Curated annotation (Swiss-Prot):
Protein name: Cytochrome b
Gene3D superfamilies: Cytochrome Bc1 Complex, Chain C
Role noted for this protein: Component of the ubiquinol-cytochrome c reductase complex (complex III or cytochrome b-c1 complex) that is part of the mitochondrial respiratory chain. The b-c1 complex mediates electron transfer from ubiquinol to cytochrome c. Contributes to the generation of a proton gradient across the mitochondrial membrane that is then used for ATP synthesis.
Organism annotation: Anguilla marmorata
The encoding gene: mt-cyb
Transmembrane portions of the chain: 33-53, 77-98, 113-133, 178-198, 226-246, 288-308, 320-340, 347-367
Length: 379
């Protein structure tokens, strides 16, 4: 009799994706981040569900309900710290996962890549609406500033902002709908993840040398299931350490003050994982231009496959392109630093230079160097 795992309609799907999946034998630890992102999503949904049981999405009680969770609910402080810092780990894994895709040319699987970019945008939206929920000062003013950017849309901008706010300012209606969105989006993300995996399994995984690996495949289980398990243990250990020893390290002190529409914080800034995009937004002294640059900073990822000029897939054997890749990493770090700094000299000009470099690397320098490397190979 055939194994149930291989014949049962439901189990067969899981088996083909997680057990008998033919996997390149040489994929490195950089291929762990996909499963780590899955773990982050599951952990965020579970902790978020328990937080939602005690949270109230009303401006008069939201801040107090979060304090109540931390003080009075059994292990509420732990659940909240795991959820807040879990978001940081989610984005760390996301950036490393995208960086891996850029380095090894995984973006040439166009459907998988583009759904990945959509997933990235969805996770960013989820994190943004979630940051508003504790209704602290930075929650309120972050929501005000970022939603206000939509007023830059020609003709319909102001109506659009008021429609999202549900009134003439960020108020109770805004908080209530943001809670609804924050509850819904993770499930949309989970659905999109399934499509992401569906397209990935049409082609199979890429690998560090960027060559066809059909001749050298091994089953996912036990080899990579255990390798992923090691990654899980490392990440969960790091998350637990952060949540227990330094729970407020990455948060903003302003969020310990309840939201007050009459007092503006001296420096309005988002969570650390949005600072690079925020720096690009602020680098352009025009509202609509800034909003377009902000959108482009993420959507530029969608044109990467179109601008691939090299005859080789990854950067493994392309030192000049490797240099550009690490310049991009450094540039992202500089933008992250600038995003958290006040708008004054010399930060303004540093941010503008870093922003120009960011787009130049994607749109001009990388395709150019890829083309040059082809010429050098023929030489």
């Amino acid at each position: 009799m055939a194994n149930l795992r291989k014949t049962h309609p439901l189990l067969k799907i899981a088996n083909d994706a997680l057990v008998d999946l033919p996997t390149p034998s040489n994929i490195s630890a950089w291929w762990n981040f996909g499963s780590l992102l899955g773990l982050c999503l599951i952990s965020q949904i579970i902790t978020g569900l328990f937080l939602a049981m005690h949270y109230t999405s009303d401006i008069s009680t939201a801040f107090s309900s979060v304090a109540h969770i931390c003080r009075d609910v059994n292990y509420g402080w732990l659940i909240r710290n795991l959820h807040a810092n879990g978001a940081s780990f989610f984005f760390i894994c996301l950036y490393l996962h995208i960086a891996r895709g850029l380095y090894y040319g995984s973006y040439l699987y166009k459907e998988t890549w583009n759904i990945g970019v959509v997933l990235f945008l969805l996770v960013m939206m989820t994190a943004f609406v979630g940051y508003v929920l504790p209704w602290g000062q930075m929650s309120f003013w972050g929501a005000t500033v970022i939603t206000n950017l939509l007023s830059a849309v020609p003709y319909v901008g102001d109506s659009l902002v008021q429609w999202i706010w549900g009134g003439f300012s960020v108020d109770n209606a805004t908080l209530t709908r943001f809670f609804a969105f924050h509850f819904l989006f993770p499930f949309v993300v989970a659905g999109a993840t399934m499509i992401h995996l569906l397209f990935l399994h049409e082609t199979g995984s890429n690998n560090p040398v960027g060559l066809n690996s059909d001749a050298d495949k091994i089953p996912f289980h036990p080899y990579f299931s255990y390798k992923d398990l090691l990654g899980f243990i490392i990440m969960l250990t790091a998350l637990t350490m952060l949540a227990l020893f330094y729970p407020n390290l990455l948060g903003d002190p302003d969020n310990f003050t309840p939201a007050n529409p009459m007092v503006t914080p001296p420096h309005i800034k988002p969570e650390w994982y949005f600072l690079f995009a925020y720096a690009i937004l602020r680098s352009i002294p025009n509202k609509l231009g800034g909003v377009l640059a902000l959108l482009s900073s993420i959507l530029v990822l969608m044109v990467v496959p179109i601008l691939h000029t090299s005859k080789q897939r990854g950067l493994t054997f392309r030192p000049a392109s490797q240099l550009l890749f690490w310049i991009l990493v450094a540039d992202m770090l500089v933008l992250t630093w600038i995003g958290g700094m006040p708008v004054e000299h010399p930060y303004i000009i540093i941010g503008q230079v870093a922003s120009v470099l960011y787009f130049s690397l994607f749109l001009v320098l990388n395709p150019l160097v890829g083309w040059l490397e082809n010429k050098m190979m023929n030489w």
